[in-house]
Amino acid sequence: MNPLLDAHNLTHHFETLLYENLSLSVNEGESIAILGVSGSGKSTILNNLSTLLPPKKGRVSLLGINDIYALSAKEQLSLRRLQLGIVFQAHYLFRGFSGIENLKVASILSGESIDKEILESFDIAKVVHQPIGQLSGGQQQRLSIARVLTKKPKIIFADEPTGNLDKQTATRVMEIMFEYIRTHKGALVLATHDQDIAQSCDRIYHLYDRALHRVK
């Protein structure tokens, strides 16, 4: 079986070296958690893997594409819109829109319809018509994940997706995401500091000493 994602010898640095010669593959139906302290490079890895930030060295293969950074900017944008789901820590919802309008943007760009069952599952169906500014941090976080699932992506990259959620809600949200990748034969790559959330994934890696160390 060919992996959905295959990263080879990634190296990245800003002022200092974050990691070097990092390799990772993710298969259909798999969930991967990356643990690490703040500033260790977890978010940067997700950005490298999802076309948002080219690594300084190395190659990323996604969904049969040998090197995603050999694509044009337009082709990378199309890949993100149609095949990838990215859950940002800061949500990046359109502030001037209501919740449902944010979902409609994802629906239009991907050609997929809004799934009302997802809204019910995330307990946001009753508030989805309110302006973003009137939603709590937890509601915004759930809405941002619902927006990603609306696109029906093949691979989901999630950066601290449960950071604003209580433990019970976080568990429920992760169950929905796991069910999604099983049903749609997709994959999930998760960056988190939450040990409990990480333990629910198929594999766990700890980022330290400039490398990924498998712990599960």
Explain the meaning of each model-derived region.
Residues 58-67:
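Conserved ABC transporter NBD signature motif
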Residues 67-85:
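ABC ATPase NBD coupling module
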Residues 131-135, 139-141:
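Conserved ABC ATPase signature
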Residues 152:
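Conserved catalytic motifs of ABC-family nucleotide-binding domains
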Residues 156-159:
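Catalytic Walker B motif of ABC-type/P-loop ATPase nucleotide-binding domains
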